[in-house]
A protein has these predicted regions:
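Bacterial N-terminal signal peptides
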Residues: 7-15
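Acidic, metal/ion-coordinating pockets
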Residues: 21-211
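Bacterial N-terminal signal peptides that target proteins for export
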Residues: 1-7
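Sec/Tat signal peptide C-region and signal peptidase I cleavage site
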Residues: 17-19
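Residues at the start of alpha-helices and the adjacent loop-to-helix junctions
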Residues: 2, 12, 27-28
Length: 211
């Protein structure tokens, strides 16, 4: 079993960035997880992100690109598109995003707008996850996804959770949600373990670099 060092690079709002802590382990034994957040339809910095992702993929064979929500609403060019959010979906497909979860502002135009965005993008190549919205939207998402890392015995699990405390209550008709407290996390992770083999200390070394 090959030990795998996992490095997390978090890029909030796609601001100017550089990796604060360059991994020192063998590239073949390193997993890079690049995480973006709160893109809000911002297209301007995607060339920078594309350059960063390209550089890491050139150096490391195992790179995952994920987003933690609030991604497709917040820019008039994206909001007013005939298919709301389509420009973002096209760019995220081109960059090779693996997983995206839903944020509170992804419901700013209501649940039907979110459903239309998801169901109207059949070409979406990334998995959209959420495990704590129900019942009206639950069929739109996968609650979690397990991604096997090629050439290793490791799979990485992503669980999507949304905090809707700041969402307009008028957009919440028919939706119930659970705050991601300790018990909720436990219930979801227990379900996840039924479908995959959990990481153990012998199969992975965690090394976190946040920027």
């Amino acid at each position: 079993m090959i030990p795998l060092r996992i490095v997390l690079a978090s890029l909030a709002c796609l601001c100017p960035f550089s990796l604060a802590q360059e991994p020192k382990s063998d590239p073949d034994k390193t997993l890079i997880i690049i995480s973006t957040s709160d893109i809000h339809g911002n297209l301007d910095n995607f060339p920078r992100l594309a350059t960063l992702v390209k550089q890491y993929r050139a150096k490391y064979p195992h790179v995952l690109l994920v987003d933690s929500g609030d991604y497709f609403i917040g820019n008039p060019y994206v909001d007013d598109c005939e298919k709301r959010g389509e420009p973002l979906t096209i760019l995220m497909n081109k960059l090779g995003y693996d997983v995206v979860t839903i944020g509170n502002h992804d419901l700013d135009y209501g649940q039907e707008a979110l459903r239309d965005h998801i169901e109207g993008m059949p070409s979406t190549k990334f998995v959209i996850t959420n495990a704590n919205l129900s019942p009206t939207l639950e069929n739109c998402f996968s609650p979690y996804v397990s991604i096997p890392i090629e050439g290793t015995s490791v799979s990485v699990g992503f669980i999507g959770l949304a905090d809707l405390q700041t969402t307009d209550v008028r957009k919440m008709a028919g939706i119930s949600w659970t705050l991601p407290d300790e018990e909720h996390y436990k219930g979801i992770t227990d379900r996840f373990r039924l479908t995959t083999t959990p990481l153990t200390s012998s199969s992975a070394i965690w090394d976190t670099a946040m920027i």
